[in-house]
Every structure is written in structure tokens, then in C-alpha cells.
């Protein structure tokens, strides 16, 4: 046989083996996949054990039991501390009840003022115009005191203009019809708060004069109303005193009648007992 004839059977055998391996798969590849799976499972197991070891070091099982015992001991100590009435009330107000906390206002807090003072900063937030605010002189209340004294004396004036007759203040009296006087007084009373809030510093001479007259008329109205209320108060006190005297007299008269009835009953009863033997 020639060399060519010997090579052909060997080649055919190799081809047959390759065909058989293609039919059932590559066994060499299967062994490599198994090795990779074993390596992955080993890595997974080792990583889980590492995590478990770390957790056991950080959170050992024995500490939980110790913490429960510590909590129980603390609760027992706390119950001992608040056995008395005063500590119990303080604990209830601070812990158990919901405290009503006042809202913290930063712009008005002393912490902000101290901080600005330490840092040498100017306070421009919410306090603009404080430094430039016009300084007002305190009002003299001498007139108010004299008016109150005159109201207490209840002295009647000739014209009914209180300020003009008592203090010689010149102003224009109100020009109102008698039928519309009550309505005018009601409106005047409603406008008194506006008079007190008015800024008279920026008024001209005519407006200032009108404001002065309106203010004096309002003072006359308030004095008149105060006098009427004082008179009504005196009448009510007089009625109250009369009612109390009537109630006292009625109470005494009722007690007197009750004593007389009891005495009459006892007298009849004693008389009946004295002559009770006559019937036998």
C-alpha cells in the first residue's frame, strides 16, 4: 500500500469522530462550564459568609438581650422617680402631654440682636425707619384730669359746650337740627377712632382748624355721654339698694311670721296636753 492509501483511512476515522462529537456536543466545553459554575458558587458562598461575619461583629446577638434588660431597668428607675405627685405632674406635662410651643420669631429674637451686635452689623430687616422715626413729645394729660374731675362733680354748663364753658377753649359748635341730633351723635361716636389715628402734622391751617373743632365737639359729646352713664349708674345703684332693703324686710317679716306660727302651735299643743286627763 502506498502512503496515500494509509492516510485516507486515518482521515476518515478523524472525520467520523468529529461527526460523532457534533451530534452529542463538545465534552471539553462542558467541563469548562462546570468549572466556572463551581467558582461562582464558591465566590457566592464566601461573600455571604463575609457579610454574615461582618453583621455578627457589628450586631452581636447577645447585645439585644442586654438592651432589653437595660430598658426594663430604666423604666423601673423612672417609675421610682415619678412616684411622688410633683415629679409625676412635671413628667406628665413635659412628656406625656403635647406642649403648646410658641412659634419662634427670628426677627424679634434676642439671639438675632446679640448676633448682629457681635458681628457689628446694622439691623435693616424689619426695622427700617426706626432710626429715622420722628420723636414725639409725651402728651400732657392735665386737661384729661381736669375733665375727669369736672365730670365727677357733674356741674351743668350754661351753653352745654363743656370745653368752652370750663376751659375757655374757642371752637365752632356743631350745627345740627334737634331731630337729627341722635343720628349725628351716633356717626360722631363711630368716627372718634379715626380722629385719634389722624396725622395732623401734615395738615394745612384750614384742615387743622377743622380737625380741632371736630375734636372739641367729640370731647363735648363724650363728656355728655359719660355724665348720662354716670347718672344711669347712680340710678341703678339706688334701685339695687332699694331692692336689697325690700328683700331684707321681706325675709325678716317671713321669719317673724314663721316664729309666730311655731309659738301658736306649741301653745295649742301644751294646752291640749294639760287638759288631756279630763276625758278619762
From Swiss-Prot:
Chief localization: cytoplasm
Gene Ontology terms: cellular component: clathrin-coated vesicle
Placement of sequence motif Ear-binding motif: 19-30
GO biological process: clathrin-coated vesicle cargo loading, AP-1-mediated; protein transport; protein-containing complex localization
Protein's cellular compartments: Cytoplasmic vesicle, Clathrin-coated vesicle
Region described as Disordered: 1-26
Annotated Pfam families: YBL010C_LAA2 (PF17104)
Keyword Transcription: no
Disruption-associated phenotype: Leads to a severe defect in clathrin-associated adapter complex AP-1 localization. Causes increases in the calcofluor white (CFW) sensitivity in cells lacking CHS6.
Keyword Transport: yes
Keyword terms, alphabetized: Cytoplasmic vesicle, Protein transport, Transport
Notes on the domains: The ear-binding motif (EBM) is required for the interaction with the clathrin-coated vesicle and its recruitment to clathrin-coated vesicles.
Subunit structure: Interacts with the clathrin-associated adapter complex AP-1. Interacts with LAA1.
Protein role: Involved in localization of clathrin-associated adapter complex (AP-1) and subsequent AP-1-mediated clathrin-coated vesicle cargo loading. Directly mediates the interaction between LAA1 and AP-1 which is required for AP-1 localization. In complex with LAA1, cooperates with the small GTPase ARF1 and the phosphatidyl-inositol-4-phosphate (PI4P) synthesis to confer temporal specificity to AP-1 recruitment.
Misc. remarks from the entry: Present with 1320 molecules/cell in log phase SD medium.
Name used for this protein in its record: Clathrin adapter accessory protein LAA2
Species name: Saccharomyces cerevisiae (strain ATCC 204508 / S288c)
Amino acid at each position: 500500500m502506498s502512503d496515500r492509501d494509509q492516510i485516507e483511512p486515518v482521515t476518515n476515522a478523524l472525520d467520523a469522530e468529529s461527526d460523532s462529537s457534533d451530534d452529542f456536543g463538545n465534552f471539553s466545553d462542558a467541563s469548562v462550564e462546570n468549572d466556572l459554575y463551581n467558582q461562582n458558587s464558591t465566590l457566592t458562598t464566601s461573600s455571604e459568609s463575609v457579610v454574615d461575619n461582618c453583621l455578627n461583629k457589628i450586631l452581636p446577638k447577645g447585645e439585644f438581650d442586654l438592651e432589653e434588660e437595660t430598658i426594663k431597668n430604666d423604666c423601673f428607675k423612672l417609675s421610682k422617680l415619678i412616684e411622688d405627685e410633683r415629679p409625676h405632674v412635671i413628667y406628665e406635662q413635659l412628656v406625656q402631654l403635647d406642649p403648646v410651643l410658641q412659634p419662634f420669631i427670628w426677627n424679634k429674637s434676642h439671639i438675632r440682636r446679640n448676633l448682629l451686635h457681635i458681628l457689628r452689623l446694622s439691623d435693616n430687616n424689619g426695622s427700617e425707619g426706626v432710626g429715622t422715626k420722628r420723636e414725639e413729645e409725651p402728651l400732657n394729660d392735665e386737661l384729661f384730669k381736669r375733665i375727669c374731675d369736672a365730670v365727677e362733680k357733674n356741674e351743668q354748663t350754661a351753653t352745654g359746650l363743656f370745653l368752652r364753658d370750663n376751659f375757655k377753649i374757642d371752637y365752632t359748635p356743631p350745627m345740627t337740627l334737634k331731630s337729627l341730633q341722635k343720628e349725628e351723635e351716633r356717626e360722631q361716636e363711630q368716627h372718634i377712632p379715626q380722629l385719634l389715628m389722624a396725622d395732623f402734622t401734615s395738615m394745612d391751617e384750614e384742615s387743622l382748624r377743622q380737625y380741632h373743632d371736630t375734636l372739641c365737639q367729640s370731647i363735648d359729646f363724650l363728656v355728655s355721654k359719660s355724665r348720662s352713664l354716670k347718672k344711669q349708674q347712680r340710678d341703678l345703684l339706688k334701685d339695687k339698694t332699694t331692692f336689697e332693703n325690700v328683700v331684707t324686710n321681706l325675709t325678716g317679716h317671713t321669719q317673724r311670721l314663721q316664729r309666730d306660727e311655731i309659738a301658736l302651735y306649741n301653745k295649742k299643743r301644751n294646752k291640749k296636753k294639760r287638759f288631756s286627763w279630763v276625758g278619762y
